[in-house]
Amino acid sequence: MDAHIASGTFRLGFIGMSNAGKSYRSRKLSEEKGFLWYQVDEEIQKAFGFSDRGQISGWLGLPAAPEYPEREKKYLELENECTRHASMRTDGKNFVFDTTGSVPHLEPETLDILRQNCLLVHLDVGEGKLERMMEKFFEKPKPVAWCGHFFVRPNESQNEALRRCYPELLKTRLAKYRELAHLTIPAQDVFDTSADETLAVIRSYLRE
């Protein structure tokens, strides 16, 4: 790791739940250590011609909407393209890859390329945080890529289906992040840390 950092060839990818700290850690590495920060969300936003991520959410909508399946398909195709492209980038400097929450649902070939070209660090929020994430979602449901994890049963309302399916989506993603990552680090271990402190934590887990 240190040899790669010194030669400007270190390639780090953060994966994990929304609000786990992926973007904050990436920004710190960019500002304090000069890493090239690649934000998949931002690249998707640009490709769609939206001015902010809120517009992506508004366009994608909730899963019961008739236009949702086709829009989700377009979103995931673009995410897959951006992720695969960035995984193979070489820009002559250290690189931090800020992935989306839906990254484990991408094509297996793309995930293989990502794993082969980056040290994937999962910022793990832990099962204990899932309940709060569910509460926040139901306070103000926001569009997400459901990736086949949403369906409405007979005589079930959309809200009831969301309440049944969303916890399963989170649990599935958490398991997939852990399976995909080279290292799983509790998100709290790098909470509010500097770039050097973040790298030191990653280094300590590599030595275990």
What residue ranges belong to the model's regions?
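Post-Walker A helix-loop "phosphate-sensing" segment adjacent to the P-loop in P-loop NTPases
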Residues: E31-V40
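NTP-dependent small-molecule kinase module
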Residues: M1-T9, K28, E32, E160, ...
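Pre-Walker A (Motif I) flank of P-loop NTPase domains
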Residues: S7-L12, G92-K93
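P-loop (Walker A) phosphate-binding loop of NTP-binding proteins
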Residues: M17
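Walker A/P-loop
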Residues: S23
